């Protein structure tokens, strides 16, 4: 009987996890994950350096033509247009962080490194 209880508890945990993955992310939501630095090249040869949060799958709204709604987004490109933004993120590399995604959209071009582009964000305190 104990085994059946453990199996049922496991299925419930899986269902809860799947339900959480199905919630579409919106502007103003919190993204939590590991911060990493990605270096790649644009098809025109330009070097790209991007800060990304890697997190659990998050669904994007179905109305965005650039997203694959059936597959959750796991990489979030935090735009760092200023030296201050880069300086804020650099000591957090490799760590678990949370940011408020003030603005976000599905990646549309080769300049967007990851599933979702986050042009405006705020680091949240631990």
Where would I find each of the regions flagged by the language model?
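Bacterial N-terminal signal peptides
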Residues: 5-15
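Boundary at the C-terminal end of the N-terminal hydrophobic targeting segment
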Residues: 19-21
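Beta-strand/loop nucleic-acid-binding surfaces
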Residues: 64-88
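Short nucleic-acid-contacting surface segments enriched for D/E, G, S/T with interspersed K/R
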Residues: 83-99
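Structural detector for short beta-strands of small beta-barrel domains
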Residues: 26-59, 101
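OB-fold/S1-family single-stranded nucleic acid-binding modules
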Residues: 53-55, 104-126
């Amino acid at each position: 009987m104990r085994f059946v209880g453990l199996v049922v508890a496991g299925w419930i945990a899986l269902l809860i996890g799947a339900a959480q993955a199905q919630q579409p992310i919106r502007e103003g939501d919190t993204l939590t994950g590991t911060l990493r630095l990605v270096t790649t090249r644009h098809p025109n040869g330009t070097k790209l350096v991007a800060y990304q949060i890697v997190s659990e799958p998050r669904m994007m709204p179905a109305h965005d033509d650039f997203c694959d709604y059936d597959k959750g987004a796991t990489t979030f490109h935090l735009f760092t247009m200023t030296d201050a933004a880069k300086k804020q993120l650099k000591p957090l590399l490799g760590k678990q962080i949370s940011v408020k995604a003030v603005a976000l959209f599905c990646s549309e071009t080769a300049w967007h490194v990851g599933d979702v582009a986050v042009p405006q964000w705020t680091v949240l305190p631990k």
